[in-house]
Amino acid sequence: MFYNYKHFFSIVLQDVVSADYKFVCIDIGAYGKQSDSGIFGFSKLSEQLERGALKAKCEKVLPDSDISVPYVLVGDGGYPLKPYLMRPYPLRNLTQEQETFNKRLSHARQVVECAFGIISNKWRILMKAIEVTPERAGNIVKYICLLHNIILDKEGMSEINGNSTESGNCHNRFVWGANTSSTRATDVREKFKAYFANNP
């Protein structure tokens, strides 16, 4: 059940990463063959967001505008569009504004990739097979995410990047199932699109 499409056994780490590269929510232990959107759809985080338990309905006015939007998570095209979860527009027949939105969303998603690169380069155990039970492997990954956050709190980004030549230039980046989406989710994405188009 942990056998993935790359033909090896794995568990999945699905996370929420803040703009300062910290892991603020992690879900570990899903089967390696499951899709990201499927894992997210059955996660406790998704359940809480659907209920509004994590203040997903709080709104903020975007800088230098009168556009008010809720706080959102950023996902790739495999995730569903939700009022609290932005995904790119499908890649066919995009307007210039939609292309701009997709580029800005992709740029925001790079923070997650950077955080993964940082922990993989600092804790090399993540770059190879961990020969323990899936439960213990999940605990190892949890502790690594926790240690990563502690180091960021105590030493800052320079300590993280100082020991990692492959993590890329993380300082210049920022964050942040069925693909049917609600009218509210589409409205939120349209607001971000309009804002990005007018604030390059």
Regions found by a protein language model. Name each.
Residues 1-200:
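Short, polybasic Lys/Arg-rich linear motifs in disordered N-terminal/cytosolic regions
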